[in-house]
UniProtKB/Swiss-Prot annotation:
HAMAP family per record: Lumazine_synth (MF_00178)
Family: Belongs to the DMRL synthase family.
EC top class, as a word: transferase
Catalytic activity, EC: 2.5.1.78
GO biological process: riboflavin biosynthetic process
Organism ancestry: Bacteria, Bacillati, Cyanobacteriota, Cyanophyceae, Gloeobacterales
Protein's name according to its UniProt entry: 6,7-dimethyl-8-ribityllumazine synthase
Source organism of the structure: Gloeobacter violaceus (strain ATCC 29082 / PCC 7421)
Length: 180
């Protein structure tokens, strides 16, 4: 049996894109800061001169899936992080936006094979959103870690598929050392 598992260490050659919604920037800015901190602490070069992280700013969360799809199809990224916040208001707008964003992000991961982290908060109140992007607990950190883990996991799986294509005689129970 082969066991596949991502890790948080092999980040030196990984390339990430972060798609950030400007709407609800009070919350989204905090998610972005924590996500960047997570990536940085796991060895990813983050910042204006980074060769590992690119940023795409969009007006709101509804626009995230389209831009993330274009980035995924470019073939340049090992993972994409989508950051936004959809907060319930007085109309049904929230239900439509939250649902379509979630579906769009999930669909593009399936269609492109590029891991896409769903970092769009969907909350009933601004207070709930602030709590999820706050000092005590900030989900942005987890979104960064999830992107790293999924990028390293899919890289291992792709490597095994490529090795098996060249060496079909490899046993089904390939030792983990061959998957590195």
């Amino acid at each position: 049996m082969t066991v596949f598992e991502g890790n948080l260490q092999d980040t030196r050659d990984l390339k990430f894109a972060i798609v950030i919604a400007r709407f609800n920037d009070l919350v989204v800015g905090k998610l972005l800061s924590a996500c960047e901190d997570s990536l940085r602490r796991h060895g990813v070069a983050v910042g204006p001169d980074s060769h590992q992280v690119d940023y795409a700013w969009v007006p709101g969360s509804f626009e995230i899936p389209m831009v993330a799809r274009q980035l995924a199809l470019s073939g340049r990224y090992d993972a994409i992080v989508c950051l936004g916040a959809v907060i319930r208001g007085q109309t049904s707008h929230y239900d439509h936006v939250a649902s379509e964003v979630a579906k769009g992000i999930q669909a593009l991961a399936f269609q492109t094979g590029v891991p896409v982290t769903f970092g769009v908060l969907t909350t009933d109140t601004m207070q709930q959103a602030i709590e999820r992007a706050g000092i005590k607990s900030n989900l942005g950190w987890e979104y960064g870690e999830n992107a790293i883990e999924m990028a390293t996991l899919t890289r291992k799986i792709r490597h095994l598929v490529a090795v098996r294509a060249v060496q079909p005689e490899l046993p089904e129970q390939t030792p983990p050392s061959l998957l590195q």
